[in-house]
């Protein structure tokens, strides 16, 4: 699907969807608890539905509560699957479920979608090998011969993806002796490990971590059933926060300003650039002001790259976005996708190994390739609405995390049409 955006000045009120990261973590924790758990206000999108489907095919009963926005999970009823477990394009599903399947006493075949195949799994595979697990990749399939895990020490790099570490944390309580996880390098995206710890705590799991988070210890212990409420998604909000800074005031509800989510820092970056930020209990409002360039380290909030780059393109002066190397191994090579998109819109941009240098200016409409990446589509959807005459390819990719994105943009006054 291709989206065409005419020039407009979108602004107004929206509520962002629930957090993908918390929904997936909550689902996997609930699936390992004895008894019934409730996930309240889950995100319903491709990535979370992938996790739900994989768990269902492993014998976990998950139903939607009638008349309420919640899922009911009857946990710890795992059984051998009858076929492949399709993870769609969800890296969190593939990585987290690889670890969970490793401790189940049967063979599992986890099938990756097309773009997911290019995202690295080796550090997690090597970590599971250390624990005695037989796991290998065959084309787009990860084959795991699960077993009772009696080894308790594992080491892996922390600077490639926090998801490898979160995967081990989610499986650790069910290991015979728990797990002691050593990170050989400081962790990237540290807030995501804190989110995992918070979720585990909601299901009764005690986690011990060193100050620098390079040592994590989780004793063997049972998951307890819980009522687990999912907060709003700061990552999904980031493009609309940028919109408020470059176009017209945007009021966003369903955002916890005290959240552990890494991408909450977006409002700090926008404030440093000159935008006016207001916030209260469960809401944020961004008012446009003349923006200046920024030096921003995205090491722990890499998903902000597209949205912050769009704001930087409209700012006066130079912006340097650093700590972005790992953006190359997301749903697309986001450094290349952002660079190509902004260049097409007339913005001078220098692409380096771990930095993007953006000279702010006056972007103009262009043909934008989203590369099937939801965050690229959303960020350029915002910018395209402001400058007009913009076409975005593969725009349906937003269903990965934000199915109503284009509808929400229209509700704010964006002129969005689907090209036939």
From Swiss-Prot:
Gene3D superfamilies (alphabetical): Enolpyruvate transferase domain
Metabolic or biological pathway: Metabolic intermediate biosynthesis; chorismate biosynthesis; chorismate from D-erythrose 4-phosphate and phosphoenolpyruvate: step 6/7
Binding-site residues, 3-phosphoshikimate: 20-21, 25, 161-163, 189, 303, 326, 330
Assigned EC number: 2.5.1.19
Pfam families in UniProt: EPSP_synthase
Subcellular location: Cytoplasm
Recorded GO CC terms: cytoplasm
Reactions accelerated catalytically: 3-phosphoshikimate + phosphoenolpyruvate = 5-O-(1-carboxyvinyl)-3-phosphoshikimate + phosphate
First-tier enzyme category under EC: transferase
Binding site for phosphoenolpyruvate: 20, 119, 163, 334, 375, 400
Keywords in alphabetical order: Amino-acid biosynthesis, Aromatic amino acid biosynthesis, Cytoplasm, Transferase
GO molecular function annotations of the record: 3-phosphoshikimate 1-carboxyvinyltransferase activity
Catalytic residue list: 303
GO BP field: amino acid biosynthetic process; aromatic amino acid family biosynthetic process; chorismate biosynthetic process
InterPro entries xrefs: Enolpyruvate_Tfrase_dom, Enolpyruvate_Tfrase_sf, EPSP_synthase, EPSP_synthase_CS, RNA3'P_cycl/enolpyr_Trfase_a/b
Record HAMAP family: EPSP_synth (MF_00210)
Complex formation: Monomer.
Main function: Catalyzes the transfer of the enolpyruvyl moiety of phosphoenolpyruvate (PEP) to the 5-hydroxyl of shikimate-3-phosphate (S3P) to produce enolpyruvyl shikimate-3-phosphate and inorganic phosphate.
Family affiliation: Belongs to the EPSP synthase family.
Stored PANTHER family: AROM/DEHYDROQUINATE SYNTHASE, PENTAFUNCTIONAL AROM POLYPEPTIDE
Protein name: 3-phosphoshikimate 1-carboxyvinyltransferase
């Amino acid at each position: 699907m291709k989206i065409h955006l005419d020039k407009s000045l979108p602004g107004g009120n929206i509520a962002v969807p629930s957090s993908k990261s918390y929904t997936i973590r909550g689902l996997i924790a609930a699936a390992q608890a004895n008894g019934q758990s409730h996930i309240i206000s889950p995100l319903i999108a491709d990535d979370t539905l992938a996790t739900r489907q994989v768990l269902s095919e492993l014998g976990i009963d998950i139903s939607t509560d009638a008349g309420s926005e919640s899922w009911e999970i009857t946990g710890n009823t795992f059984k051998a699957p009858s076929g492949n477990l399709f993870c769609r394009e969800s890296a969190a599903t593939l990585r987290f479920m690889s670890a969970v399947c490793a401790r189940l006493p049967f063979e599992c075949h986890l099938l990756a979608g097309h773009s997911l195949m290019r995202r690295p799994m080796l550090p997690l595979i090597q970590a599971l090998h250390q624990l005695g697990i037989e796991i290998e990749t065959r084309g787009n399939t990860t084959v795991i011969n699960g077993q009772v895990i009696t080894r308790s020490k594992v080491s892996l790099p922390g600077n490639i993806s926090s998801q490898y570490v979160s995967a081990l944390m989610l499986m650790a309580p069910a290991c015979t002796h728990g797990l002691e996880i050593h990170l050989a390098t400081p962790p990237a995206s540290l807030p995501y490990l804190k989110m995992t710890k918070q979720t585990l705590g909601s299901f009764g799991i005690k986690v011990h971590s060193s100050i620098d988070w390079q040592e994590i210890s989780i004793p063997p212990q049972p998951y307890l059933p819980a009522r687990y409420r999912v907060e709003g998604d700061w990552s999904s909000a980031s493009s609309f926060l940028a919109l408020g800074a470059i176009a017209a005031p945007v009021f966003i509800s369903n955002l916890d300003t005290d959240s552990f989510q890494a991408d909450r820092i977006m409002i700090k970056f926008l404030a440093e650039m000159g935008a006016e930020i207001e916030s209260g209990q469960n809401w944020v409002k961004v008012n446009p002001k003349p923006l200046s360039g920024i030096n921003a380290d995205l090491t722990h909030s890499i998903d902000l790259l597209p949205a912050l780059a769009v704001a930087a393109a409209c700012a006066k002066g130079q912006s340097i976005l650093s700590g972005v190397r790992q953006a190359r191994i997301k749903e697309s090579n986001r450094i290349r996708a952002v660079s190509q998109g902004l260049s097409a819109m007339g913005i001078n941009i220098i692409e380096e190994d771990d930095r993007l240098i953006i000279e702010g200016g006056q972007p103009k409409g262009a043909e934008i390739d989203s590369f099937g990446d939801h965050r690229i589509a959303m960020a350029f959807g915002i910018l395209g609405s402001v400058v007009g005459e913009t076409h975005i390819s593969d725009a349906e990719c937003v269903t990965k995390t934000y199915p109503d994105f284009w509808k929400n943009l229209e509700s704010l006054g964006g002129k969005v049409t689907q090209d036939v």
